[in-house]
């Protein structure tokens, strides 16, 4: 389990994250919602160690990790799919997937499961990442994050700019991974219907703080749609 307690983060004189607390449980999808600019991506970057926190704690499996480097956090089992995918355009699909195995012993094979989850990657194994469509690149980015077998998978707006058929495939994979029961999933998402379909529980952020939280099945009753409407 990933546990965040009362973290604060500043950028210059701006207070970006304000006493944010949350838990991401194994076997569950925790969805983070909120309008643009409320601190969602900064929160994820803080969890990965890409930006420092001023106060509070981040723990994984009971061990505090907020002083660890991004590399050390990845080795502990945090997989991150950033907004914009950030695949290596000049590398082949196979080479991109092997980048996800950088923390594993040399010669570790690419898990066959990745091609079961995303069959299109098997067909395009020797194509350059830059030649793939946006949806295919997103599938590659998720597969790369899964290659090392993370205990926590963090996704930042995986449906952004993706065609509906691939959004459906990505949702199916996320649900399957959660139901398998060996991974916690933390999902930042702007597409409300996609988030509602997947959420076991949720938080809504506003101005860097947690405005609301609850069970995914209660999102409509709790009025979450109106809280995140643009």
Residue ranges and their predicted role:
Residues 48:
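Helix-to-loop junction immediately C-terminal to a conserved catalytic motif
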Residues 147-151:
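A short, proline-enriched helix->beta-strand linker immediately N-terminal to the Walker B motif
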Residues 128-132, 136:
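Conserved ABC ATPase signature
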Residues 64-84, 111, 123-126, 219-224:
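ABC ATPase NBD coupling module
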Residues 33-35:
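The feature captures the beta-strand-to-loop junction immediately N-terminal to the Walker
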Residues 56-64, 76, 109-110, 116, ...:
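Conserved ABC transporter NBD signature motif
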Residues 91, 132, 145-146:
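ABC ATPase signature
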């Amino acid at each position: 389990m990933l546990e965040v307690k009362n973290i604060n983060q500043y950028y210059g004189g701006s207070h970006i994250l304000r006493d944010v607390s949350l838990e991401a449980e194994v076997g569950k999808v925790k969805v983070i919602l909120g309008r643009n600019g409320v601190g969602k991506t900064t929160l994820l970057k803080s969890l990965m160690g890409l930006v420092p926190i001023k106060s509070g704690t981040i723990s994984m499996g009971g061990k505090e990790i907020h002083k660890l480097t991004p590399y050390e956090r990845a080795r502990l089992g945090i997989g991150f799919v950033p907004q914009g995918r950030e695949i290596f355009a000049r590398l082949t699909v196979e080479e991109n997937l092997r980048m996800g195995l950088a923390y594993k012993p040399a010669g570790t094979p690419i898990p066959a499961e990745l091609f079961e989850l995303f069959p299109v990657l098997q067909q395009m194994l020797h194509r350059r990442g830059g030649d793939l469509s946006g949806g295919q690149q997103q599938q590659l980015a998720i597969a790369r994050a899964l290659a090392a077998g993370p205990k926590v998978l963090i996704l930042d707006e995986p449906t952004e700019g993706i065609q509906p058929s691939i959004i459906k495939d990505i949702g199916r994979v996320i649900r399957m991974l959660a139901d398998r029961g060996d991974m916690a999933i933390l999902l930042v998402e702007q597409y409300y219907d996609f988030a509602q379909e997947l959420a076991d529980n949720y938080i809504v952020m506003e101005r860097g703080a947690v405005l609301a939280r609850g069970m995914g099945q209660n999102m409509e009753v709790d009025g979450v749609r109106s809280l995140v409407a643009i």
